[in-house]
Curated annotation (Swiss-Prot):
Gene Ontology CC terms, in alphabetical order: cytoplasm
Top EC class of this enzyme: isomerase
Protein name: Chaperonin GroEL
This protein's record includes keyword Phosphoprotein: no
Any one GO molecular-function label of the UniProt entry: ATP-dependent protein folding chaperone
SUPFAM superfamilies named among the record's database cross-references: GroEL equatorial domain-like (SSF48592)
Keyword line: ATP-binding, Chaperone, Cytoplasm, Isomerase, Nucleotide-binding, Stress response
Record note on quaternary structure: Forms a cylinder of 14 subunits composed of two heptameric rings stacked back-to-back. Interacts with the co-chaperonin GroES.
Catalytic activity as recorded in UniProt: ATP + H2O + a folded polypeptide = ADP + phosphate + an unfolded polypeptide
Localization per Swiss-Prot or TrEMBL: Cytoplasm
Native source organism of the sequence: Mycobacterium xenopi
Length: 120
């Protein structure tokens, strides 16, 4: 029963990460799997599940706090291109996204659709 709960948790983590950030699902999934695995190992060794949960929640708060303190705004076209290129794994795609964002501005909307036409 714990394994099924763990699998559902990992699935929910990936979905929420995708919904909120649009990227990082692999990292979030790996972290969630490690938390579930180590959590189950600790519970099997006699750890109090509620104390473990509280500890994880405190750790999440600290990590979130640290990430927010060290986060940097992505403001310039070059920064947008670099960030998008990392996410896409392709500099040309990063440049294209930066160009599109430059044209529509901060409040604009960019729609990306899959095409069956090669090269377009």
């Amino acid at each position: 029963p714990y394994e099924k709960i763990g699998a559902e948790l990992v699935k929910e983590v990936a979905k929420k990460t995708d919904d909120v950030a649009g990227d990082g699902t692999t990292t979030a999934t790996v972290l969630a799997q490690a938390l579930v695995k180590e959590g189950l190992r600790n519970v099997a060794a006699g750890a109090n599940p509620l104390a473990l949960k509280r500890g994880i929640e405190k750790a999440v708060e600290k990590v979130t706090e640290t990430l927010l303190k060290t986060a940097k705004e992505v403001e310039t076209k070059e920064q947008i291109a670099a960030t998008a290129a990392i996410s896409a794994g392709d500099q040309a795609i990063g440049d294209l996204i930066a160009e599109a964002m430059d044209k529509v501005g901060n409040e604009g909307v960019i729609t990306v659709e899959e095409s069956n036409t090669f090269g377009l």
